[in-house]
Swiss-Prot record:
Listed name of the protein: Large ribosomal subunit protein bL12
GO CC term, one of those recorded: cytosolic large ribosomal subunit
Keywords, in A-Z order: Ribonucleoprotein, Ribosomal protein
Subunit-structure text: Homodimer. Part of the ribosomal stalk of the 50S ribosomal subunit. Forms a multimeric L10(L12)X complex, where L10 forms an elongated spine to which 2 to 4 L12 dimers bind in a sequential fashion. Binds GTP-bound translation factors.
Protein role: Forms part of the ribosomal stalk which helps the ribosome interact with GTP-bound translation factors. Is thus essential for accurate translation.
Length: 130
């Protein structure tokens, strides 16, 4: 196997879809036992009161949209998946729908997550937003 230069690797990554890149990152993290997440600083303070913990949970600003089931109208779901996930070809969308449950959108705004969920549920799909 020939060694690829950094520029060649970047060119390969540019050709990949977001889903393919996401799968690559997951495999990379598993293989080398690392994480691509940015380190988070945690300030040590007193334990929050019960009311404060509830408020923190309500302040979530990024959501993941997960396709749980395609339902009976798989073709309609594939069309909506292609619309929602940018840069996705027909084959990739079909593979994604066939391999449920799958993450469709990661860390999107609440409006985008709710809009995607509504469009998918209108076609008969089962969707969860986390």
């Amino acid at each position: 196997m020939s060694k690829l230069s950094s520029d060649e690797l970047l060119d390969v990554f540019k050709e990949m879809t977001l889903l393919e890149l996401s799968d690559f990152v997951k495999k990379f993290e598993e293989t080398f036992e690392v994480t691509a997440a940015a380190p988070v600083s945690v300030a040590v303070a007193g334990a929050p009161a019960a009311g404060e913990a509830g408020e923190a949970a309500e302040e979530q600003s990024e959501f993941d949209v997960i396709l749980e089931s395609a339902g009976d109208k798989k073709i309609g779901v594939i069309k909506v998946v292609r619309e929602i996930v940018s840069g996705l070809g027909l084959k990739e969308a079909k593979d994604l729908v066939d391999g449920v449950p799958k993450l469709l959108l990661e860390k999107v705004a609440k409006e985008a997550a709710d809009d995607a969920k509504a469009k998918l549920e209108a076609t008969g799909a089962t969707v969860s937003v986390k």
